[in-house]
């Protein structure tokens, strides 16, 4: 079987689902002698809802997680992944990779499993909806108002268009991106090359 990243992602999601998890992203770095496969996971929506109930005090027992919602943080914005989750997923998925020979020609490879982190990538419409109101930095395929690099607060979606509030970043004086005279900019989701959250600590 030839190496196929989509096949690997699909296999990873099968394993993740059996653990109450979702695959957020898959990254691959290949070389002649060594390969690196990174899988980013989080609790699925049902499990995140349970953790949100725990953090609000509605459930007495709270498990220790890599990312629990801080005070004032939207509970939908954390992954809820534990080290035990990563370890269990890594064991099961590593076995599947070898049994189904999904890493052909790789005599050695490293499988790295972790949460997506506070600076996670946004890759789907659901991500933009879930993290509405968050700070984000993004780049576009084609320039918007003469600029391909933007930072701002996501003000919501209008159809397939993302509205970005630029005033938050101007007030903080962050970033070296070209400034726009406008306070908001509209960017088509299909024009977004890469988008990533900016942690607010």
Curated annotation (Swiss-Prot):
GO BP terms: ribosomal small subunit assembly; translation
Localization, UniProt: Cytoplasm
Name assigned to this protein: Ribosome maturation factor RimP
InterPro entries per the UniProt record, alphabetical: Ribosome_maturation_RimP (IPR003728), RimP_C (IPR028998), RimP_C_sf (IPR036847), RimP_N (IPR028989), RimP_N_sf (IPR035956)
Main location: cytoplasm
Family as reported in the entry's similarity comment: Belongs to the RimP family.
Reported function: Required for maturation of 30S ribosomal subunits.
Coiled-coil regions listed in the entry: none
HAMAP family: RimP
Any Pfam family hit: DUF150_C
Keywords noted in UniProt: Cytoplasm, Ribosome biogenesis
One GO CC term, this protein: cytosol
CDD domains found in the cross-reference section: YlxS_C
């Amino acid at each position: 079987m030839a190496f196929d990243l989509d096949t690997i992602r699909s296999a990873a999601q099968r394993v993740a689902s059996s653990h109450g998890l979702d695959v957020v992203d898959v990254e691959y770095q290949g070389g002649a002698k060594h390969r690196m496969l990174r899988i980013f996971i989080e609790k699925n929506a049902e499990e995140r809802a349970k953790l949100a109930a725990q953090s609000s005090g509605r459930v007495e027992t709270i498990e220790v997680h890599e990312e629990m919602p801080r005070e004032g943080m939207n509970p939908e914005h954390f992954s809820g992944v534990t080290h035990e989750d990563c370890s269990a997923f890594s064991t099961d998925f590593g076995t599947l990779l070898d049994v189904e020979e999904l890493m052909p020609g790789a005599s050695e490879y490293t499988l790295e499993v972790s949460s997506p982190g506070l600076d996670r990538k946004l890759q789907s419409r659901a991500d933009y909806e879930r993290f509405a109101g968050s700070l984000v930095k993004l780049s576009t395929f084609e320039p918007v108002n003469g600029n391909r690099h933007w930072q701002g607060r996501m003000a919501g979606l209008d159809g397939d268009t993302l509205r970005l509030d630029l005033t938050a970043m101007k007030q903080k004086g962050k970033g070296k991106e070209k400034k726009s005279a406008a306070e908001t900019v509209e960017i088509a989701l299909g024009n977004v090359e890469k988008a990533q959250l900016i942690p607010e600590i």
